[in-house]
């Protein structure tokens, strides 16, 4: 029942929220948000298990699939979309599914999250296989859409994780790995787009970023597989080459073009004094890891 969930409780600090000044509201929201990272810290060992599982799936050619309803679903779609330009992966490698489909990203779709079968159907549409990793996201921890999807994923042998913001969440029983970030009562009662949503976003950031490090998408702390889809990212790409190799802007630009705008390739060309094809071949041998390539 909803009344038994911490995310649905009334926050004693904000009982008279409508009487507070804007400054007072901002201060109490800031104070409440400060506890989110502490709640996440308690679950880091479980989040690490998810990262290890996702990385293993990627190495097998599998995909990461986020799945949720409402805010939770939107956060999964957002993180999946950001992985494409940030890490240069295809839009099929990290997928975000939301109950009700794409139109639910901007407006609510009545009844979509209450369907057990809809989650299963959405996974069937993307041809889920056992090498994929499915993460179900639900602040309440009880969304039928997510439960149905997790059950189907486990049925076909895919690894699963559940991320919720309540202790002993219902979805935890339907996943291999359970992350329960207990963020407590919201400033605005029941509005889980607030602390719960913030916690979920931070955890998804951790999972996608750390998993991408694990498959060679990062050199030092540089996004060397960035996809330069606009002028800003083109300039960032050149700055990354400069930072990684200690060359000037003109040299970085020259190798950037010679590498056909592949930052990682340009870096290896410079650091190993090699031509493009040789750099590509050596990167392939090192499974895409720049550090391993240049240390050979």
UniProtKB/Swiss-Prot annotation:
Catalytic activity: N-acetyl-D-muramate 6-phosphate + H2O = N-acetyl-D-glucosamine 6-phosphate + (R)-lactate
Domain SIS: 54-217
Enzyme Commission number, as recorded: 4.2.1.126
Pathway(s) served: Amino-sugar metabolism; N-acetylmuramate degradation
Molecular function as annotated in GO: carbohydrate derivative binding; carbon-oxygen lyase activity; ether hydrolase activity
PANTHER family, A to Z: GLUCOKINASE REGULATORY PROTEIN
Assembly description: Homodimer.
NCBIfam families recorded: N-acetylmuramic acid 6-phosphate etherase, PRK05441.1, PRK12570.1
Protein's UniProt name: N-acetylmuramic acid 6-phosphate etherase
Organism: Listeria welshimeri serovar 6b (strain ATCC 35897 / DSM 20650 / CCUG 15529 / CIP 8149 / NCTC 11857 / SLCC 5334 / V8)
